[in-house]
UniProtKB/Swiss-Prot annotation:
Classification lineage: Eukaryota, Metazoa, Spiralia, Lophotrochozoa, Mollusca
Domain notes: The cysteine framework is III (CC-C-C-CC). Classified in the M-1 branch, since 1 residue stands between the fourth and the fifth cysteine residues.
Name of the protein this chain belongs to: Conotoxin reg3.5
Family that this chain belongs to: Belongs to the conotoxin M superfamily.
Compartment list: Secreted
Alphabetical keyword list: Cleavage on pair of basic residues, Disulfide bond, Secreted, Signal, Toxin
Amino acid sequence: MMFKLGVLLTICLLLFPLTGTALDGDQLAEHMLDISSGINDRWFDPVRKCCMRPVCTCPCCS
């Protein structure tokens, strides 16, 4: 009985892998919002695409 359940579980995981599940519909939009949120910052320099703060630890400013 346990062998049959193990075989069934293996077949199900092969047919429907957990990493193959679709993302939420709004997940990409939220990610793009996080990326573009720095554009509205008053310290943001659009030419350098980085902040102009006096003490900046961003990798693009160093």
